[in-house]
UniProtKB/Swiss-Prot annotation:
Disordered as annotated region, ranges: 33-96
Keywords, ordered alphabetically: Glycoprotein, Proteoglycan, Signal
Organism: Caenorhabditis elegans
Residues bearing attached sugar chains per UniProt: S61, S63, S84, S88, S109
The protein's name: Chondroitin proteoglycan 8
Length: 115
């Protein structure tokens, strides 16, 4: 009976993992959003104000995008606004979110001693 329970648990975890993986936004979409926001931030200040007004209208209008895409656009826009306020030394978003993180043993951790 125990092997059947373990098999059922394995199958349910596999199904849940596949469902979660399908909901992740593909890397190409993330890069496209980043390029669009960078191009918009390079334009003049007058058009930036118009772009900001346009994006707030489309965000609330239910443009047919998934909630993950809308949230991603908001995050990228917020990062660009913060970067433009910090000046020339501002950091730029250059990578996509990490989907899986493997545990890494940092120097000194896991040794169990305080020396």
């Amino acid at each position: 009976m125990r092997p059947f329970i373990l098999l059922a648990l394995l199958v349910s975890v596999t199904v849940a993992f596949n469902i979660f993986r399908d909901e992740v936004v593909p890397e190409e979409q993330l890069l496209a959003v980043r390029r669009t926001t960078r191009d918009a931030s390079d334009s003049s200040s007058d058009s930036d104000e118009k772009d900001d007004a346009k994006t707030t209208v489309t965000d609330g209008s239910g443009s047919g995008e998934s909630p993950a895409e809308e949230q991603l656009r908001r995050v990228v826009r917020d990062v660009d606004e913060e970067a433009s306020g910090e000046g020339s030394g501002a950091a730029e978003v250059t990578s996509v979110p990490v989907r899986f993180v493997r545990s890494v043993d940092a120097e000194g951790s896991g040794s169990g001693s305080d020396e």
